[in-house]
Amino acid sequence: MWIPWQDLSPVTLENLIESFVLREGTDYGEHERTLEQKVADVKRQLQCGEAVLVCSELHETVNIMPRSQFRE
């Protein structure tokens, strides 16, 4: 189930994004990026529709994924 990011409180959204970023590993590419930079990148992707929040009732989880991979 897709969850509009706008429906979440700012604190909840920030916590979800931070949790997602911290789970994604440590591939920094050429330059290491701060947690704040990574959170800002994900937030921008949610705001422009490149990424979506997805809730799995089966697994009782919320995840962030590229919109192109999301199937209802």
From Swiss-Prot:
Protein name: UPF0270 protein YheU
InterPro entries: UPF0270, YehU-like_sf
Gene3D superfamilies linked: YehU-like
Signal peptide: none
Organism: Shigella flexneri serotype 5b (strain 8401)
Family label: Belongs to the UPF0270 family.
